[in-house]
């Protein structure tokens, strides 16, 4: 997403009205203060108070404290938890796609390969390595011989 504004809509402060594809509802401009990026952020941050991320706040706070970051605002901790959850989800999804591609190649090369729709996948290093490499993380299997 290099070069994009990540969905943030900027309005001209001089009263011009380029909405970049977003309608303001009534068109009268009465809802103008609700469409500013700061109001979107404050709405999102207030919604984080009710949201429970998959990574508990205590775990996120622990690792933030280990890194030297301290915050008493649980919304900040939950925002970081949500970002970590999204990052991990993207990596796991990429690993799943690598696994599907690998198993598809194995079943097409094998005559009479199974084509079950409800197949279970196991996360292996073989699939995780290329997914992490896409994100610039290099991992290797541990050599068990000494």
Curated annotation (Swiss-Prot):
Belongs to the TAF10 family. InterPro entries: TAF10. It is found in: Cytoplasm; Nucleus. It comes from Drosophila melanogaster (Fruit fly). Belongs to the TFIID complex which is composed of TATA binding protein (Tbp) and a number of TBP-associated factors (TAFs). The N-terminus interacts with the histone fold of Taf8. The lineage of its organism: Eukaryota, Metazoa, Ecdysozoa, Arthropoda, Hexapoda. At embryonic stage 9, expression is seen in the mesodermal layer and midgut primordia. The mesoderm-specific expression persists in later stages of development and at its highest level is detected in midgut, hindgut, and differentiating somatic muscle fibers. Coexpressed with Taf10 in the lateral epidermis and anal plate. Keywords: Cytoplasm, Nucleus, Transcription, Transcription regulation. This is Transcription initiation factor TFIID subunit 10b. Residues 16-43 are annotated as: Disordered. Coiled coil: none annotated. One of its GO terms (molecular function) is promoter-specific chromatin binding. GO terms for cellular component: cytoplasm; nucleus; SAGA complex; transcription factor TFIID complex.
């Amino acid at each position: 997403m290099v070069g994009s504004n990540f969905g943030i809509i900027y309005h001209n402060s001089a009263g011009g009205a380029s909405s970049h594809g977003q309608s303001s509802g009534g068109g009268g401009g009465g809802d103008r203060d609700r469409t500013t990026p700061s109001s979107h952020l404050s709405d999102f941050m207030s919604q984080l108070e009710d949201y429970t991320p998959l990574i508990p706040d205590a775990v996120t706070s622990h690792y933030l404290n280990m890194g030297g970051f301290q915050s008493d605002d649980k919304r900040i901790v939950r925002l970081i938890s949500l970002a970590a959850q999204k990052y991990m989800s993207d990596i796991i999804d990429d690993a799943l796609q690598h696994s599907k591609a690998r198993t598809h190649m194995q079943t097409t090369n094998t005559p009479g390969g199974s084509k079950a729709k409800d197949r279970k996948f196991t996360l292996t290093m073989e699939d995780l390595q290329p997914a992490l490499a896409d994100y610039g993380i290099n991992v290797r299997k541990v050599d068990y011989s000494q």
